[in-house]
UniProtKB/Swiss-Prot annotation:
Belongs to the ATPase alpha/beta chains family. Pfam families: ATP-synt_ab (PF00006), ATP-synt_ab_C (PF00306), ATP-synt_ab_N (PF02874). This is ATP synthase subunit alpha. Gene3D superfamilies: 2.40.30.20, ATP synthase alpha/beta chain, C-terminal domain (1.20.150.20), P-loop containing nucleotide triphosphate hydrolases (3.40.50.300). Keywords: ATP synthesis, ATP-binding, Cell membrane, CF(1), Hydrogen ion transport, Ion transport, Membrane, Nucleotide-binding, Translocase, Transport. It is a peripheral membrane protein. It comes from the Bacteria. One of its GO terms (molecular function) is proton-transporting ATP synthase activity, rotational mechanism. Its EC number is 7.1.2.2. It comes from Geobacillus thermodenitrificans (strain NG80-2). The gene is atpA. The record marks 362 as: Required for activity. Its main location: membrane.
Amino acid sequence: MSIRAEEISALIKQQIENYESQIQVSDVGTVIQIGDGIARVHGLDNVMSGELVEFANGVMGMALNLEENNVGIVILGPYTGIKEGDEVRRTGRIMEVPVGEALIGRVVNPLGQPVDGLGPVETTETRPIESPAPGVMDRKSVHEPLQTGIKAIDALVPIGRGQRELIIGDRQTGKTAVAIDTILNQKGQDMICIYVAIGQKESTVRTVVETLRKHGALDYTIVVTASASQPAPLLFLAPYAGVSMGEYFMYKGKHVLVVYDDLSKQAAAYRELSLLLRRPPGREAYPGDVFYLHSRLLERAAKLSDAKGAGSLTALPFVETQAGDISAYIPTNVISITDGQIFLQSDLFFSGVRPAINAGLSVSRVGGAAQIKAMKKVSGTLRLDLAAYRELEAFAQFGSDLDKATQAKLARGARTVEVLKQDLHQPIPVEKQVAIIYALTRGFLDDIPVEDVRRFEKEFFLWLDQNGQHLLEHIRTTKDLPNEEDFNKAIEAFKKTFVVSQ
């Protein structure tokens, strides 16, 4: 069968008309140097700062240094399989993490990948880890209390929803314990908690997760962990991943608490990256933008206005000091960014005052507006009593004869210190805190021996559960003190049943 020439030309025309050229254009660069988790890449001329790039073996990186002839990229994973001459592609995306309800109760790494062995996290939404903080008009002043369940904090340095309160102290002074107790106390408060562990030992993170699980707190908590064995970029990104997961809930009108444990290790990881990228070092070898590293993170904590859904994100950043030096670079930076600090002192911790809060150096700049009326009334003189006690304590050591007023101040101070002590993982509801502090500040404990004060408190709480429920209910619902006469009578009635140890 012969094919005519015109048929051939018609077929060729048809083929030409149907031809579609699909050219895929992608920016590709070449690795010119690799080592210490940093790659220098030539040829990625249009890459953006903070953009994700993909190496030939599938490992992702993040462009941090944009220089004249090359790009400095930090590698977010194992870098042993990457070699000189390898291809690197732009992705056109910035770093994002999965967000949503499915993360609650899970332990994930800073990339949102589960590390708890419970299978994949079923989320569909993501959020960029870097996003602008709410503006001035989108915010509302802090006015709702965030009860930590720790008497010394709720009475002396109250925290409000949307506040940033720094927890600062040497290692082994109970910083993590304060945060865990605060998370445990949020049970039933419609609060979502996010615990970000930065550079912690994996065994420590495991202990924290088990504590949360034992107390039923994992039902409303997300744990983000970048352990000490992980590459520095993951330690640097962990807090931003945590706050992004929290912002998802905040913009839905919910209340979130984020704990960063701790930012000193994040700053050290960022210093490591900056020095490897050959950025000029500043004070203590930190880069010049280490202040911005923390300020852009902590500014994302906010109490949103009603128009924006009235959600809140409260931040509890930790900073570890060396030998109690709070005038070092990172501590002073974070103190100036936050709305107050809780200073934990090792001397107090080792002398048995736990939580070891130094009332003189601890302050809450906005929390006073969030304190409930009842607590405001009873704790007004507490800080002054403690300050006077610490001052007089130094003089009393010389053993000279003291007048009656001084002895009374010392006695009240010693009882105040005892009342503010608290056992680990036993947060106390605010109405019971008000009751014991009321008894203290109104002088009902002045004739109780100091060694019996803790026992008095325990038995008083049990007595209130049985005989004083109406008083506790009044404080809980009205946020104010009940009739003082009734309160005094109740305390007197309990005191009659209390047996002082011989």
